[in-house]
Design a protein with these regions (language model features):
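Short, surface-exposed amphipathic charged segments that create phosphate/polyanion-binding patches used
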Residues: 98-99, 122-124, 271-273
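Histidine/acidic residue-rich metal-binding segments in metalloenzymes
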Residues: 24, 59-73, 79-81, 98-104, ...
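Surface-exposed cleft-lining segments at the edges of enzyme active sites
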Residues: 121-134, 162-173
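Non-cysteine beta-strand/loop elements that form the S-adenosyl-L-methionine
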Residues: 33-40, 105-115, 153-160, 196
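Active-site rim beta-loop-alpha module in soluble metabolic enzymes
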Residues: 157-166, 192
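An N-terminally biased module of ancient metal coordination in phosphate/nucleic-acid-related enzymes
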Residues: 1-86, 90, 94, 99-102, ...
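Charged catalytic cores and adjacent phosphate/nucleic-acid-binding surfaces used
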Residues: 1-10, 20, 31, 116, ...
Length: 273
């Protein structure tokens, strides 16, 4: 059993209306022993059809104050950790370095939500190119980000772009992008970074988490050991989403343990059948 959901969003994220209480109560009801709140902090996020420019920023002092209160309130039934999901862009390396040194996060997820200033969530990103071209560009941009930014603990939802392609996984396999993906995985391993298994891919109809199990398996083959797990829930009903399947996938990739982060340090938990 996996007993920690290390990726979830609350009202502090522009794209979630969920109260922190609702997410924590859902975690307790799902049998979680720990959670990490990881609200979106995407500096320099552009205007989109749904959000104004700069929408994915929030008051970190208020965030820490509120979550610290809830750590105490829930301490007898759930360990509450304070994290953040930062949106990687190559020019933000120094900004995120200063931010993560200033605030005592337990866990920092680094995620690529923008590809040369465009969010693949919107169809405009795919106009004039094939899914294959778009996916390859996303991996190349991820490599560029990793070379510029070191202030995170685990890479969030690698292959996220596949969720939004016109044909989703039809144009995607590890083998097709092995050169780019291997460069990403080798960088993570050599820099002591984790790889997130993000279960949101299951609810987006992909039939697999992000990244694909073949990528997780390759991470292990290359010597990777730090796999974090999160549902990427923005609503309480998605907390610990499809976690039984998560256990089966991770063990099928050769892992007998997963990682949680406390104080920016990995803690390894054995996967209990």
């Amino acid at each position: 059993m996996i007993t920690c959901d290390a990726h979830m969003h609350t009202r502090f994220s522009e794209d979630s209306d969920a109260s922190v209480h609702s997410m924590l109560d859902a975690a307790v009801n799902k049998g979680m022993q720990a959670v990490c709140i990881t609200d979106h902090l995407d500096k320099d996020f552009p205007e989109t059809p749904d959000f104004p420019a700069g929408a994915f920023m929030f008051d970190l002092d208020e965030y820490f104050s509120r979550l610290t209160q809830l750590k105490t309130e829930y301490q007898k039934k759930l360990e509450v950790r304070i994290g953040v999901e930062i949106g990687l862009q190559p020019h933000l390396g120094e900004y995120y370095k200063e931010l993560t040194e200033k605030y005592p996060f337990d866990f920092v997820i680094g995620s690529v939500h923008l590809i040369h200033g465009q969010d693949p969530y919107y169809r405009g990103f795919f106009e004039g190119r094939s899914d294959e071209e778009a996916y390859r560009e996303a991996f190349q941009v991820t490599i560029e980000n990793l070379k510029k930014i070191d202030s995170f603990d685990s890479l969030g939802h690698l292959d996220y772009v596949v969720r939004y392609g016109a044909h989703q996984a039809e144009a995607y396999s590890y083998r097709k992008y092995a050169e780019e993906i291997d460069e990403i995985l080798k960088h993570l391993i050599s820099h002591g970074k984790g790889l997130e298994m993000n279960m949101a891919g299951m609810k987006y109809g992909l039939g697999f988490p992000n990244p694909h199990p073949d990528v997780i398996r390759r991470y292990k083959e290359l010597g990777g050991e730090i796999v974090t797990i999160g549902a990427d829930a923005h609503r309480s009903e998605h907390v610990a989403f499809d976690y039984e399947q998560a256990r089966e996938i991770l063990t099928g990739c050769g892992f007998s343990y997963y990682a949680e982060f406390k104080g920016r340090k990995p803690v390894f938990r054995r996967i209990v059948p």
